[in-house]
């Protein structure tokens, strides 16, 4: 059986709602993403609860601090048994290299370490506001290249950026793509650069982060398995 390409974002207000969803799916259907809101509310115990259920967990906390602090946070993530953890590439080479070094003692059991380049909600005007008068993709490519040079496993990127990043950085460099929608004609939230699951995989994405289209569906497992079938 092929590994799940879908990472479901558990963006629920209450832990009980998240666990109710989790009880409807299996680790062979998807992986799970825990973001800042749920982690801040429910902490490491919630992550460990999901790991004990057999799920691969992507801890999406986007660490961005001085190298020593980020290294310690990444190590703590590995201790929880997560499958993937991320940092902000804009923290720089030294920070990313420190994070990578912190995982060396874990060997094959180390989580994948990826970096966030440009948030998918950001457009050129947003970059200009913070002093970067360049197109978003130019900054994405710059940070993704730096991430690879620092020895990380991949980056988060929009699906529109995936094909160029794959050709520039190679097949082994993992691309994790949010902004996935089952119907791109409906723009209902804060992801500006969106694409369908099939198109994103064709573009070069390795893993797809999908939230509301699955978690808010009347029958989440049916939707999830339909997506998986389309990607088979």
Curated annotation (Swiss-Prot):
Disulfide bonds: none annotated. GO terms for cellular component: cytosol. SUPFAM superfamilies: Ribulose-phoshate binding barrel. GO terms for biological process: 'de novo' pyrimidine nucleobase biosynthetic process; 'de novo' UMP biosynthetic process. PROSITE patterns: OMPDECASE. It catalyses: orotidine 5'-phosphate + H(+) = UMP + CO2. Homodimer. This is Orotidine 5'-phosphate decarboxylase. It comes from Tolumonas auensis (strain DSM 9187 / NBRC 110442 / TA 4). The lineage of its organism: Bacteria, Pseudomonadati, Pseudomonadota, Gammaproteobacteria, Aeromonadales.
